[in-house]
C-alpha cells in the first residue's frame, strides 16, 4: 500500500491554505531566530524540539498581538453590546496550528521551518493540550469562542486557569489509572498574565444590618489573577479574549499567625487559598457537592462580574475612571451566558453587587439581572443536576443564601398568583428542596433568574419543556428556546483533515469554512465515480496515518482496509459503550462458530475517560480491554476483528481519529444524550453513523435523510412506555440465544480466566439493574450492525452515503449556533466584515 502523504507534503501543494510568500517566509525565519535567542536564550547547538516549538509559538503570537490590541481598541471605540460567556470548562486542545490557520500564515510558517531544517509536525507535537474540560460541555465552549471571534462579536470567555486539567489516563493491566495533567510545567506561550487587573473575592464571614442595608463582613479574602488567552477569528483580523482566573493568596495573609510569631506557617498557609484554581473536577454528568467545587464556582463568578461591571463603567479605551454611573443601560450593553448551572451563582452575585454595593432597589436590580442573564441546560440526567446543601452555602456564602431565599420567596408568590392553591406545584418549583438535607436547586435558580433558557438539540429542548422543566414552561413559555449545538469547521475539518478540505475546495471554492451550508453543493457529486475515488483515497490515507500512530503507541498492527468502527466519548452507562462491547463479543462468537463465513473485517476502537470515582465505568473499560485481549490474540480471528481501547482520549487524539473513521457509534439510550457533538465531527469527516434517535442524531437524520444513516432502537416514547410497563431484562436474555451466550461468557469468566467473578457485576447490571435498556435495544443494534457490514462491502454505495453525510453537515457549524444565540438571546448581530489588519493603519 502506498505510503500516506504527510500533512506537510500535502500542504506544499496548492490548497485552501494558499501559497507562501517569500518575504513573509524570511520574516518568519527572522522572528523565529530572534525568539530562540532573546526569549528562550538558546542557540541551535543546545535547542531542543520544545525550544523550537516555543520559538515558533511566540513568532505566531507576534502576528496576532497587533490584531488583538486593535480588536480591543475597536470594541472600546464602538462600544457595542458585549457578550460574556461564563463556563467552568474550556477544552481547548492545542493552539499552534489553529492559530496559524485562522491568521492565514500556515504556509509561510511551514516553509520557514522547512528551510530551517525542521519538520513543523514534530514541533506541533510538543504542545500540551489545554485540557481544561471533561468532555462535550468544555469542548463546546471552545468551539463557541472560535465562532464568536469569527462572527465578529464583542465576546469574552471567562473561566478558571486550572493548574491541573483533566487527568491523563493510563491503561495498566487493562485498568484505568489517573495521572495528574501538569500542562503548565513548561509554561504556556499563549497566555498573558494581567496582575494589574487582580481582583478580590470573599468567602465565609457574616451578614450585618446597617442603615445603608445589608453588609457582608469578616470575610476571608482571596485574589483572582487574570490570564488572557487570544482567540483569533478565521481570516477576519478579529482576536477576542478568553480570560482565565487563577487564585492568589492576599498579601496581608493570616495576621493571627504573625501575632503568634509563626511566620513560616503563615507563608505555608497561603497554599490553601491558592488551591481554588489547582485542579479541574473530573466529573462529567455527575454532581458531587464538594466545598472546593462550590468555591471554584463562586470564585469565577465573583471575579468575572467585577470585571464586567468595570468594563461597563469605563467609557473608552484605557479609562479606569467610572464614567457610566447608572445601570439603566446594563442589559443593553451586557449579555451573560451561563454554560450550564456551574456559573449560576452569577445571578445572586449580580444582585448582591447591585443592591448592597450600588444601592439599587431590589426591583430595579432584579429587572437588570434577568434581562442580562441567560441559561443553557446541558443534561436531563437527575444525578448531574446541581443541588447545593444549604448548610454549605450558609457557611461559605451567607449573603448569597439570603438573596436566594428572597428570590425564591418572590418566585413562590408569582407561582401562587398564577396557580392558586397548588401547593404541590409550589413544592416542585421551589429553589429550596426540603426533603432530606435542605438543598438549593441551581437549575431552578438559573431559570427564574434568566430571560432565556435553552436546550442544545431540538429533542432535548422538547424534553425540557415536556418533563424536566415542565412547570416552569407552563409558567413562562416565552423563556424557552432551542439552540442545537455545533462544531467549528476550522478545527474539525480544515485543521484535522487537510486532504478532504482540499477536495472540497476544488469543487466549491474556499468560502465554506465560514459558510458551512455551502457543503450542500457536494450532493451533486455523491454518485460521481471520480469524486468517490478521491474521497476514498483521502480516507485511506487518514486510516494509514492513524494505523501508524496506533502501531507506534499501542503496539497493535491493524488491517487498514478493515472498517474503522469508532466510539469515543466519556465512559458513562447512558452512552452505552457496554452495548458496543456486547456487539464485539457477538461478532467474535460468530467468527468462532464459522470461521469460513463471509465477514466484513472491522477494527473496533473505543476511547474515553471514566470519572475516577465511577466504579461501573472503570469496570466497563476493564471489560473492553479484557475482550480485546481475547479477540486480538485468537489466531482463528486473525485480521477479521481487532479491538483497541484508545488510551487518554483528548482533543488532539480526536483530531487524528475523526478523519480516519468509517463508522461512528452514537448509541445512547433515547432521551439521555442532550445533543452530542462528536457525532457532528464524524459526519463532517465522512464517517457514517449508527445511532439511536437521541440528541442531535435526530436532526442529523433529518438533514441527510434516513437512507444515509443507520438508525436503530427505541424512541424516547418507546423507552417511556417500556419503563411504565416494567422492563425485565431476563425476557430478552431468554429469548435471544446470541445475547444469552454473550452474557454467560461475561459472568462465567470467559474473558477473565484468572478471576472468573471479575465481571459478574456487569452481568448483574445488564440483567437486574439496567437503567439504560441495553438488552431491549440489543437485537435492533445487531441487525443495524449487520446492515452496516453489508453496506460497507458495496463501496460505491458507502461512498455515496459518505459524501451525502459531508454535504448535510452545514447546519452543524457552531457559526450557525452562535448566530442564533446572538440574534435570539443576546440581541447582537453577527458580522462577516474584516477588521483592517494592523499594518494597514496607523497605530495609536
Curated annotation (Swiss-Prot):
Cross-referenced InterPro entries: Glycg_phsphrylas, Glyco_trans_35, Pyridoxal_P_attach_site
PTM annotation (Phosphoserine): residues: 15
Reaction equation(s) it catalyzes: [(1->4)-alpha-D-glucosyl](n) + phosphate = [(1->4)-alpha-D-glucosyl](n-1) + alpha-D-glucose 1-phosphate
GO MF assignments: glycogen phosphorylase activity; protein homodimerization activity; pyridoxal phosphate binding
The entry's keywords: Carbohydrate metabolism, Glycogen metabolism, Glycosyltransferase, Phosphoprotein, Pyridoxal phosphate, Transferase
The protein's Enzyme Commission number: 2.4.1.1
Record's GO cellular component terms: cytoplasm; cytosol
GO-annotated biological processes: defense response to Gram-negative bacterium; determination of adult lifespan; glycogen catabolic process; insulin receptor signaling pathway; negative regulation of innate immune response
Post-translational modification: Phosphorylation of Ser-15 converts phosphorylase B (unphosphorylated) to phosphorylase A.
Similarity comment: Belongs to the glycogen phosphorylase family.
Function description: Phosphorylase is an important allosteric enzyme in carbohydrate metabolism. Enzymes from different sources differ in their regulatory mechanisms and in their natural substrates. However, all known phosphorylases share catalytic and structural properties. Required for glycogen breakdown in skeletal muscle.
PANTHER family attached to this UniProt entry: GLYCOGEN PHOSPHORYLASE (PTHR11468:SF13)
Protein name in the entry: Glycogen phosphorylase
Native source organism of the sequence: Drosophila melanogaster
Classification of source organism: Eukaryota, Metazoa, Ecdysozoa, Arthropoda, Hexapoda
Amino acid at each position: 500500500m502506498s505510503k500516506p502523504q504527510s500533512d506537510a507534503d500535502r500542504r506544499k501543494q496548492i490548497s485552501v491554505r494558499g501559497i507562501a510568500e517569500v518575504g513573509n517566509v524570511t520574516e518568519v525565519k527572522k522572528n523565529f531566530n530572534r525568539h530562540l535567542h532573546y526569549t528562550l536564550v538558546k542557540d541551535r547547538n543546545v535547542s531542543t524540539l520544545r525550544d523550537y516549538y516555543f520559538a515558533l509559538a511566540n513568532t505566531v503570537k507576534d502576528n496576532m498581538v497587533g490584531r488583538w490590541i486593535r480588536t480591543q481598541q475597536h470594541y472600546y471605540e464602538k462600544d457595542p453590546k458585549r457578550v460574556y460567556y461564563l463556563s467552568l470548562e474550556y477544552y481547548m486542545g492545542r493552539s499552534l496550528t489553529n492559530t496559524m490557520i485562522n491568521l492565514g500564515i500556515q504556509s509561510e510558517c511551514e516553509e520557514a521551518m522547512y528551510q530551517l531544517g525542521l519538520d513543523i509536525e514534530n514541533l506541533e507535537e510538543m504542545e500540551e493540550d489545554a485540557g481544561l474540560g471533561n468532555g462535550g460541555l468544555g469542548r463546546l465552549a471552545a468551539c463557541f469562542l472560535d465562532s464568536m471571534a469569527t462572527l465578529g462579536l464583542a465576546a469574552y470567555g471567562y473561566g478558571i486557569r486550572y493548574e491541573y486539567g483533566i487527568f491523563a489516563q493510563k491503561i495498566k493491566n487493562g485498568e484505568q489509572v489517573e495521572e495528574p495533567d501538569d500542562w503548565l510545567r513548561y509554561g504556556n506561550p499563549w497566555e498573558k498574565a494581567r496582575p494589574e487587573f487582580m481582583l478580590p473575592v470573599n468567602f465565609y464571614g457574616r451578614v450585618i444590618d446597617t442603615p445603608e442595608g445589608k453588609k457582608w463582613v469578616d470575610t476571608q479574602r482571596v485574589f483572582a489573577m487574570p490570564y488572557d488567552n487570544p482567540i483569533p477569528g478565521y481570516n477576519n483580523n478579529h482576536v477576542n479574549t478568553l480570560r482565565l482566573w487563577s487564585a492568589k493568596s492576599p498579601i496581608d495573609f493570616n495576621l493571627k499567625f504573625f501575632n503568634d510569631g509563626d511566620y513560616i506557617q503563615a507563608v505555608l498557609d497561603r497554599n490553601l487559598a491558592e488551591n481554588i484554581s489547582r485542579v479541574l473536577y473530573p466529573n462529567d454528568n455527575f454532581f458531587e457537592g464538594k466545598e472546593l467545587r462550590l468555591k471554584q464556582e463562586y470564585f469565577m463568578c465573583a471575579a468575572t462580574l467585577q470585571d464586567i461591571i468595570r468594563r461597563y463603567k469605563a467609557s473608552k479605551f484605557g479609562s479606569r475612571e467610572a464614567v457610566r454611573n447608572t445601570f439603566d443601560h446594563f442589559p443593553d450593553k451586557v449579555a451573560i451566558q451561563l454554560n450550564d448551572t456551574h456559573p449560576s451563582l452569577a445571578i445572586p452575585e449580580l444582585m448582591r453587587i447591585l443592591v448592597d454595593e450600588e444601592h439599587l432597589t431590589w426591583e430595579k436590580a432584579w429587572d437588570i439581572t434577568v434581562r442580562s442573564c441567560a441559561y443553557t441546560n446541558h443534561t436531563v440526567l437527575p444525578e448531574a443536576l446541581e443541588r447545593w446543601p444549604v448548610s454549605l452555602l450558609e457557611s461559605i456564602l451567607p449573603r448569597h443564601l439570603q438573596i436566594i431565599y428572597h428570590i425564591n420567596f418572590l418566585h413562590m408568590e408569582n407561582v401562587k398568583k398564577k396557580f392558586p392553591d397548588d401547593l404541590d406545584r409550589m413544592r416542585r418549583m421551589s429553589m429550596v428542596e426540603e426533603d432530606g438535607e435542605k438543598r438549593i436547586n441551581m437549575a431552578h435558580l438559573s431559570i427564574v433568574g434568566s430571560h432565556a433558557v435553552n436546550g442544545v438539540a431540538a429533542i432535548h429542548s422538547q424534553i425540557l419543556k415536556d418533563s424536566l422543566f415542565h412547570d416552569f414552561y407552563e409558567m413562562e413559555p416565552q423563556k424557552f428556546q432551542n439552540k442545537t449545538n455545533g462544531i467549528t469547521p476550522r478545527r474539525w475539518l480544515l485543521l484535522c483533515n487537510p486532504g478532504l478540505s482540499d477536495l472540497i475546495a476544488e469543487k466549491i471554492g474556499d468560502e465554506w469554512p465560514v459558510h458551512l451550508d455551502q457543503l450542500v453543493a457536494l450532493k451533486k457529486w455523491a454518485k460521481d465515480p471520480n469524486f468517490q475515488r478521491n474521497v476514498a483515497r483521502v480516507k485511506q490515507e487518514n486510516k494509514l496515518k492513524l494505523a501508524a500512530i496506533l502501531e507506534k503507541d499501542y503496539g497493535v498492527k491493524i488491517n487498514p482496509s478493515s472498517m474503522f468502527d469508532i466510539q469515543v466519548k466519556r465512559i458513562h452507562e447512558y452512552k452505552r459503550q457496554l452495548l458496543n462491547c456486547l456487539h464485539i463479543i457477538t461478532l467474535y462468537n460468530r467468527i468462532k462458530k464459522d470461521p469460513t463465513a463471509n465477514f466484513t473485517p472491522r477494527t473496533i476502537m473505543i476511547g474515553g475517560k471514566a470519572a475516577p470515582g465511577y466504579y461501573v465505568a472503570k469496570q466497563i473499560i476493564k471489560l473492553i480491554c479484557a475482550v480485546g485481549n481475547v479477540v486480538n490474540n485468537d489466531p482463528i480471528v486473525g485480521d477479521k476483528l481487532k479491538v483497541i481501547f484508545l488510551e487518554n482520549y483528548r482533543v488532539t487524539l480526536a483530531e487524528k481519529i475523526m478523519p480516519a473513521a468509517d463508522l461512528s457509534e452514537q448509541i445512547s439510550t433515547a432521551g439521555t444524550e442532550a445533543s452530542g457533538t462528536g457525532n457532528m465531527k464524524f459526519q463532517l469527516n465522512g464517517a457514517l453513523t449508527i445511532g439511536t434517535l437521541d440528541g442531535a442524531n435526530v436532526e442529523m437524520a433529518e438533514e441527510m435523510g434516513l437512507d444515509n444513516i443507520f438508525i436503530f432502537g427505541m424512541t424516547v416514547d418507546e423507552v417511556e412506555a417500556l419503563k411504565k410497563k416494567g422492563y425485565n431484562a431476563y425476557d430478552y436474555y431468554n429469548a435471544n440465544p446470541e445475547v444469552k451466550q454473550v452474557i454467560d461468557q461475561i459472568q462465567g469468566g470467559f474473558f477473565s480466566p484468572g478471576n472468573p467473578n471479575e465481571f459478574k457485576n456487569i452481568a448483574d447490571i445488564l440483567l437486574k439493574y439496567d437503567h439504560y435498556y441495553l438488552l431491549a435495544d440489543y437485537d435492533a443494534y445487531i441487525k443495524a450492525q449487520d446492515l452496516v457490514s453489508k453496506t460497507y462491502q458495496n463501496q460505491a454505495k458507502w461512498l455515496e452515503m459518505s459524501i451525502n453525510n459531508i454535504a448535510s453537515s452545514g447546519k452543524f457549524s457552531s457559526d450557525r449556533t452562535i448566530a442564533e444565540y446572538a440574534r435570539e438571546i443576546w440581541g447582537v448581530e453577527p458580522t462577516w466584515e474584516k477588521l483592517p489588519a494592523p499594518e494597514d493603519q496607523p497605530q495609536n
